[in-house]
Structures are given as structure tokens and as C-alpha cells.
């Protein structure tokens, strides 16, 4: 199809995701702001194929990864929020995400920085 994957960052509910599935077979990623352990359960209940766990503030800061301790995360999850080449290894090893989402952590002056991106890829390949 024309859409390969759908990533939702709004207030979409389970009914919205169900209706979206009727229109496309593309995998759905639902992003969530993680402030409490209950936030993890709420996003999982929406029925997306993947969940993206994020600080959600756009500040380049990580959320408290200890909120994931003991959490039963059923869907494969993406880890986002404040990840940089310098903290990527520790974050990935501690929470074991399916995937990582990098943005401002690989930028210099709000532009993607080739060297930072290459360093992040090197770190991931070493895991």
C-alpha cells in the first residue's frame, strides 16, 4: 500500500486505532508520555502493534527508565526521549527496547549531525 507504517502522537483511543486498522494493514506505533507505571498499561491497552515510550516534552530529556522496572510490556517497544550517543548504550542495555528513536540527541544547532549519527549507529551495532 501507500502507507508503510503509522505513528500516532495524539490523543487517539482504542476505537480510533481499531477503525484505522479497517483502512490499512500498515503496522501502528502509538507514542505515549511516560510519567507513571500506569501510563505503560494505558498505552498497551490501545491495541497498537508497537508502543513508543517517550518523555513527550520535546526537551531532549529522558523519562525515568526505572518506571519500566517490573513492567510487563506486551508489544515491542521503541525507546525515545533524550537519547544521545553518550547515553544510548546504558539506556538500551537497561530496558532492552525493540528499537530506539533518536532525534535532538544527534543534532548540533538543531540540525542532524553526521558524526553524532554515526556514533549512535556504532553504539547500537556493538550491543
Spell out what each predicted region is.
Residues 19, 68, 72, 92, ...:
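C-terminal helical cap(s) of enzyme catalytic domains, especially alpha/beta-barrels
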Residues 78-80, 99-103:
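Conserved active-site loop/cleft motifs that coordinate metal ions or position small ligands
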